[in-house]
Design a protein with these regions (language model features):
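Walker A/P-loop-proximal flanking segment of P-loop NTPase domains
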Residues: 1-101, 115, 582
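Short linear interaction motifs
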Residues: 21-40, 104-109, 218-225, 259-266, ...
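A short acidic (Asp/Glu
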Residues: 54-55, 96-100, 250-256, 289-296, ...
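P-loop NTPase nucleotide-binding core
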Residues: 55-236, 309-311, 317-403, 407-409, ...
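Short, well-ordered alpha-helical packing segments
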Residues: 56-59, 126, 261-272, 337, ...
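C-terminal leucine-rich, beta-strand-based interaction scaffolds used for sensing/assembly
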Residues: 90, 215, 375-674
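The catalytic "switch" region of P-loop NTPases
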Residues: 219-240, 248-466, 473, 516-545
Length: 674
């Protein structure tokens, strides 16, 4: 039976450490060096940008798996001297504390639950750090332990266990331990009580636990200190503490409380200790980290660069104007090859330099796309209709466009747009049509033509009632928007379409490249499903209404722009001053960006001194809305009135909201030098 190597989108979170060695891409390490240096780092990004994959490298199981596989550990040796422990808040059970919240819970009860959360996290992380020591010790690999800076001396391990088990951070609750295993068992017993409590198997925790709650972060600092003072780890060995799925804590704001916010503030308190003994690594979605990270039960906040720094996975792989600085393609190509190798798909070919290009081929050239959208005879009919609609244009220009269409339908369509722009010269100082170009020449400058190709292809396909085609390596990478999850999601659907197209075949019969029409079908299905699953997070329904309204508006705006005056109108731009006057809209747009519905960037306005922000729909939504995914020229200038109408699902823009009515700028952007 044919299988899909991309069936499991979250493979790096579900497989064993041994398999992780095979599919993990070291490219991400080269770009994320800050994660392996001292200091607190917030690793944030949209779903599926590689946060958990990166944090998993800090786990001892990953380090040991690389050693067993005789594969070089991807972290440079000078940065790889560390141990650590961590917690995944979704998996450890901490989110179940909210089950004990009641609408009639008084302040004291809520506060005690907050401090119990802190104690639970302390115990879990310290237990995981001890587990790390034991895992390295059990390998009996002296060279590996030397690289990490761990001593296997039993006397040192015993001295550590004796001293740390009786440290005052525990409030005297643990007996003196003679070994790390004994101390680990004592911690596990306490965690076991918490599990029974969280699962409602007991009504209350024992008084011994209630009377010995630890201070958030304190035992974590003490375990790092004790490990070094006893010689179990070297003074130069870094101690990293991982806390993943941080954004999940806000889901605990239930029963009329802000319990989840308080739990986040407790974590902020641990980070804000400004103590170099440990370095925190917080994994969170883009929307998860608060603008003002308040410290628990204070008005104080963490300071960027002093208390923490960001590693923004979205920015790491975001496409810039200079495509040569775009890191995502190499990362995606490596992941693609590793997935195929792990699935043993044509394994003899899976080490080629660019297997993705072999599978998807180059993105079709514009002329090839035109041939797919429209036949020559149908294209001539379409151009004739366009010519007949040109007003105040002399016969010479119409004949020129007609002759152009015989050899180049795309240029003929663009010529109609160029003529429309120039024939509107009454609104321009030097308007009007110029002299006819020579038979083999074109009236426009090269950049004018290049910037309008995506819009021309969209309009030509629509004129012949054809769907836009989506295929080729560059196209798929662009639609991925720098997100590895979206990339894998697209490949999953492309592969499914390919398997359907080869029903009854053996895996050996599947040969690259995947046909363009099959790729396009898979991309469209992926886009439709991605839009349908837009149900996560707060305001999910309103975000979906907004995205639908924006998508419909942008499509109609582009289709109706026959003069192609605004080829960049597959996005929109708002004045920052206007946004600051509408905090409700700002909050909504931040949520939409945080959940990946929109992409936001600073916008250099054509108005001197004006500060704006521009927004685009996530590229993967382009196929479902039938709009180009490439961002060229200026986005549509709108005001907050239009944006608020989109919140209500209204897409029609009134004259008072248009860019030209607002500031009179966009009409000047495509002037007489075209």
């Amino acid at each position: 039976m044919l299988s899909n190597p991309f069936h499991d989108l979250y493979l790096s979170e579900a497989i064993s450490e041994d398999a992780l060695v095979e599919i993990f891409s070291p490219i991400i390490v080269e770009l994320a060096g800050a994660v392996f240096e001292s200091g607190n780092v917030i690793v944030r990004g949209l779903q599926g940008t590689g946060k958990t994959m990166l944090l998993n490298l800090l786990r001892p199981e990953s380090r040991i798996a690389y050693r067993k596989a005789k594969v070089k550990f991807p972290i440079p040796k000078e940065q790889a001297k560390f141990i650590g422990g961590g917690v995944n808040l979704r998996k450890c059970g901490a989110l179940e504390f909210a089950q004990h919240l009641q609408t009639d819970s008084d302040e004291r009860q809520v506060k005690e639950l907050e401090l119990l959360f802190a104690d639970f996290i302390n115990y879990w992380i310290v237990s995981d750090i001890l587990a790390t020591i034991l895992k390295f010790s059990e390998t009996a690999d002296e060279l590996l332990c030397s690289e990490v800076g761990i001593s296997l001396d039993p006397e040192r391990l015993k001295a550590f266990a004796e001293a740390f088990s009786t440290d005052d951070c525990w409030f005297g609750v643990h007996p003196r331990a003679n070994s790390v295993q004994e101390l680990q068992a004592s911690l596990a017993s306490r965690i076991g009580w918490y599990r029974r409590f969280l699962n409602l198997n007991i009504d209350a925790l024992p008084d011994e636990i209630l009377g010995s709650k630890t201070v958030i972060g304190d035992p974590i600092l003490k375990v790092a200190e004790a490990l070094k003072s006893s010689g179990v780890i070297s003074d130069s060995t870094k101690v990293f503490v991982r806390i993943d799925q941080y954004e999940q804590l806000t889901t605990l704001n239930v029963a009329g409380t802000q319990y989840g916010d308080a739990c986040q503030q407790l974590i902020h308190k641990a980070i804000g200790a400004r103590d170099g003994r440990v370095s925190y690594r917080i994994g969170t979605r883009s929307h998860g980290w608060p603008a003002r990270p308040t410290i628990y039960r204070t008005t104080d906040t963490l300071e960027l660069k002093r208390d923490f720094s960001f590693l923004d996975m979205d920015e790491l792989f975001r496409r810039r104007e200079n495509v040569r600085t775009w890191n995502f393609p190499d990362f995606a190509r490596d992941i693609f090859a590793r997935r195929l190798r792990a699935a043993a798909f044509h394994s003899e070919n899976s080490i080629r330099k660019n297997l993705l290009a072999e599978a998807l081929k180059d993105t079709p050239k514009p002329q090839e796309r035109v041939a797919r959208y429209v036949s020559q005879s149908s294209g001539m009919d379409i151009i004739r209709r366009e010519i007949s609609g040109l007003e105040n244009v002399d016969a010479g220009w119409k004949n020129y466009i007609q002759r152009l269409a015989e050899d180049d339908l795309l240029s003929a369509w663009l010529a109609c747009a160029w003529v429309r722009q120039k024939s509107a010269g009454s609104r321009r100082k030097s308007g009007g049509l110029t002299i006819l170009p020579p038979e083999d020449g074109r009236p426009w400058k090269p950049y004018w033509y290049k910037e309008r190709i995506p819009l021309a292809l969209m309009q030509l396909a629509s004129a012949n009632r054809q769907a836009l085609a989506w295929s080729g390596e560059d196209e798929v990478l662009n639609l991925s928007g720098g997100q590895i999850l979206v990339f894998l999601f697209l490949l999953q659907h492309i592969w499914d379409a390919w398997l359907r197209d080869n029903r009854g075949s053996t895996v050996e019969a599947l040969k690259f490249p995947i046909p363009s029409e099959v790729q396009s079908q898979g991309v469209i299905e992926a886009s439709q499903e991605w839009k349908a699953k837009q149900i996560e997070g707060p305001n999910a329904r309103q975000r979906r209404v907004f995205v639908d309204a924006v998508g419909r508006h942008l499509y109609r705006r582009l289709i109706n722009d026959k003069a192609m005056s605004y080829p960049g109108a597959n996005g929109f731009s708002l004045r920052v001053d206007d946004l600051e006057s509408d905090q409700r809209l700002v909050s909504f747009l931040c949520q939409a960006v945080g959940y990946g519905d929109l992409y936001e960037a600073p916008h250099t306005s054509k108005n001197p001194g004006e500060i704006r922000k521009k927004y685009y729909l996530a590229p993967i939504l382009s196929p479902v809305f039938r709009i180009p995914s490439v961002h060229t020229k200026e986005p549509e200038y709108i005001n907050i009135g239009q944006a608020n109408r989109w919140l209500l699902g209204e897409e029609q823009q009134g004259a008072s909201d248009s860019a030209t009515a607002e500031d009179g700028v966009q009409g000047k952007l495509f002037g007489d030098d075209a």
